[in-house]
From Swiss-Prot:
Keywords: ATP-binding, Cell inner membrane, Cell membrane, Ion transport, Magnesium, Membrane, Metal-binding, Nucleotide-binding, Phosphoprotein, Potassium, Potassium transport, Translocase, Transmembrane, Transmembrane helix, Transport. PROSITE patterns: ATPASE_E1_E2 (PS00154). The keyword ATP-binding applies. It holds the Pfam family E1-E2_ATPase. The gene is kdpB. It is an enzyme of class 7 (translocase). This is Potassium-transporting ATPase ATP-binding subunit.
Length: 682
């Protein structure tokens, strides 16, 4: 991927984020974050108290109250800045996509063929169902499906990948995206969306959407933070009469400072930024998530359904051998296999044609001159072939051909059954060829398991994630490849219905399921899965059914998607732990300072040896504001992620962020107190 990655603190983004942070000071914007709204209210109150003291309306230290008020405003501004910076990074990514949209003219065809008469119309006038012709050098004017032709397409504006890709009719690579450029040849495209509904439009709207919906975990955490805020608010409110009864009432300024330092402002100020940054990191991996809910669900996934081809294996299955049935000549089998594959544009189909040509000099026949009827492969029939003259030739999976033979009154030979088993045991895929009700033999298709994939599955297993391989191969082939790849389970001879049933079965057990897909037949399963990553090269139906789209069309990306989701959840949990642990140190700083005059015995709690009550309170407030700024890089980049079990991750994070949350404030508050004393501000 060659798309330029944004630096964490781009100067342009910083300036815009500072501006947006000030704009977010309005009460309407603050009300969306209850914790920070309390800080905002405290800032307003202390500002009013400062003005009242300056004008002599009430007594008190205007300087001390003013400085407290200033740092409370900084606390709100820093939280706003964190959110604005995260949003700014997403909007910058959206702006780079806007540059792809160009006003152009399109050749709208009057009939669905490349030599039909064409009208030049503005691309904005194209509607769903319109047929357009694009040639080398043209920008594709709409999202659609290729219905004729084949061409090299530059998709770098969308995917960031500089290498061109092939888009052609009749396969899994028929989907094209508006805004990409044709480099060679021509395509006839059927537009699949109306203006404003293109994939590019949806990408832009998603990443720059102003009203980001909170995810379930965010809502649950927000409720916890509100509950803690209410508890501390009530506790702080009782301290004034308590201290007044002791003969020396604590000032409102000190009580506000105490409240702000005790409530979980750190995570409260960074919560939105973490969510926005999670979606931004997903986009950085070239994956478009339709919502933060999808990213969060990726972090909770515990079952991965992985297509064998392209994910676990290299995906370039090639015909390697013809194994004829008893009494059948190998050349006869090769000839029938080649005829059945003439209209098969898949890599496997082309390899069968080539192998027959190489082995027996069987030249590829002209499809048009045969006057034959081609039978395409479907997920239901699981076979394809040709009807020519009085011959009915089919090739397909073992079970599909067996049903076909038996339905035509034939018998499936035992020797072919044995050949199928032998091929499958070697990890190859057997395809059976039949003419009428007579089985001619087996074609062996070989694929290679990706290097390092077994180790990745072992890491996922450590994390408690179950891996399930999905394949159309028979059970023996599937078992051999599953054992070699190291997956936990497999689904052989998979149909769309079987995939859907498997997902529902796992969900009924309370598990969250993730899968990838690219075809229209994957759409029901994608719609059912909790995390559904559709390939950008896939069909429009698949992209609409999924809740994420992988711009690189790399099925292995599903593992990275889960990692990003888990990193976002870990970041949120780690900073929550750090924020709550912070309160302990601030308690030791402010409580003795606030009540030292009323209850001198509380000086025993001044374990940090802070210079004076005022410096202690001011140091805690300053630290409370600055820690948000220091944690912004962590919130945006995410905590360090390692593939560990849930219990191991919990122990690790408690040590780092729990203990760190206790120790860092003691050090930070003491350092600030020393600096204030040296500067004569204590």
């Amino acid at each position: 991927m060659s798309r330029k990655q944004l630096a964490l603190f781009e100067p342009v983004l910083l300036v815009q984020a500072l501006t947006d942070a000030v704009k977010k000071l309005s009460p309407r914007a603050q009300w969306r974050n209850p914790v920070m709204f309390v800080v905002w209210a405290g800032s307003v109150l202390t500002t009013l108290l400062t003005l009242a003291m300056v004008t002599g309306q009430i007594t008190g230290s205007a300087l001390f109250t003013g400085v407290i008020s200033l740092w409370l405003w900084f606390t709100v501004l820093f939280a706003n800045f964190a959110e604005a910076l995260a949003e700014g990074r997403s909007k910058a990514q959206a702006n780079s996509l806007k540059g792809v949209k160009k006003t152009a003219f399109a050749r709208r065809l009057r009939a669905p063929r490349h030599d039909a008469q064409a009208d030049n119309v503005p691309a904005a006038e194209l509607r769903k169902g319109d047929i357009v012709l694009v040639k080398a050098g043209d920008i594709i004017p709409c999202d659609g499906e290729v219905i004729e032709g084949g061409a090299s397409v530059d998709e770098s504006a969308i995917t960031g990948e500089s290498a061109p890709v092939i888009r052609e009719s009749g396969g899994d690579f028929a989907s094209v995206t508006g805004g990409t450029r044709i480099l060679s040849d021509w395509l006839v495209i059927a537009c699949s969306v109306n203006p404003g509904e293109t994939f590019l439009d949806r990408m832009i709207a998603m990443v720059e959407g102003a009203q980001r919906r909170k995810t379930p975990n965010e809502i649950a955490l927000t409720i916890l933070l509100i509950a803690l805020t209410i508890v501390f608010l009530l506790a702080t409110a009782t301290l004034w009469p308590f201290s007044a009864w002791g003969g020396n009432a604590v000032s409102v300024t000190v009580l506000v400072a105490l409240l702000v330092c005790l409530i979980p402002t750190t995570i409260g100020g960074l919560l939105s930024a973490i969510g926005v940054a999670g979606m931004s990191r997903m986009l950085g991996a070239n994956v478009i998530a339709t919502s933060g809910r999808a990213v969060e669900a990726a972090g909770d996934v515990d079952v991965l359904l992985l297509d064998k081809t392209g994910t676990i294996t290299l995906g370039n299955r090639q015909a390697s051998d013809f194994i004829p049935a008893r009494g059948v000549d190998e050349r006869t089998l090769a000839d029938a296999a080649q005829l059945a594959s003439l209209a098969d544009e898949t890599p496997e189909g082309r390899s069968i044609v080539i192998l027959a040509k190489q082995r027996f000099n069987l030249r590829e026949r002209d499809v048009q001159s045969l006057h034959a009827t081609f039978v395409p492969f479907t997920a239901q029939s699981r076979m394809s072939g040709i009807n020519i003259d009085n011959r009915m030739i089919r090739k397909g999976s073992v079970d599909a051909i067996r049903r076909h033979v038996e339905s035509n009154g034939g018998h499936f030979p035992a020797d072919v059954e044995q050949n199928v088993e032998n091929v499958a045991r070697l990890g190859a895929t057997p395809l059976v060829v039949v003419e009428g009700a007579r089985v001619l033999g087996v074609i062996a298709l070989k694929d290679i398991v990706k290097g390092g994939i077994k180790e990745r599955f072992a890491q996922l297993r450590k994390m408690g994630i179950k891996t399930v391989m999905i394949t159309g191969d028979n059970r023996l082939t599937a078992a051999a490849i599953a054992a070699e790849a190291g997956v936990d389970d497999f689904l052989a001879e998979a149909t769309p219905e079987a995939k859907l049933a498997l997902i529902r079965q796992y969900q009924a057990e309370g598990r969250l399921v993730a899968m990838t897909g690219d075809g229209t037949n994957d759409a029901p399963a994608l719609a059912q899965a909790d995390v559904a990553v559709a390939m950008n090269s896939g069909t429009q139906a698949a992209k609409e059914a999924g809740n994420m789209v992988d711009l690189d069309s790399n099925p292995t990306k599903l593992i990275e998607v889960v990692h990003i989701g888990k990193q976002m959840l870990m970041t949120r949990g780690s900073l929550t732990t750090f924020s709550i642990a912070n309160d302990v140190a601030k308690y030791f700083a402010i409580i003795p300072a606030a009540f030292a005059a009323t209850y001198p015995q509380l000086n025993a709690l001044n374990v940090m040896g802070l210079h004076s009550p005022n410096s202690a309170i001011l140091s805690a407030v300053i630290f409370n504001a600055l820690i948000i700024i220091f944690l912004i890089p962590l919130a945006l980049k995410g905590v360090s992620y390692k593939p560990l079990s849930a219990s191991a991750m919990l122990r690790r994070n408690l040590w780092i962020y729990g203990l760190g949350g206790l120790v860092v404030p003691f050090i930070g508050i003491k350092v600030i107190d020393v600096l204030l004393t040296l500067l004569g501000l204590a």
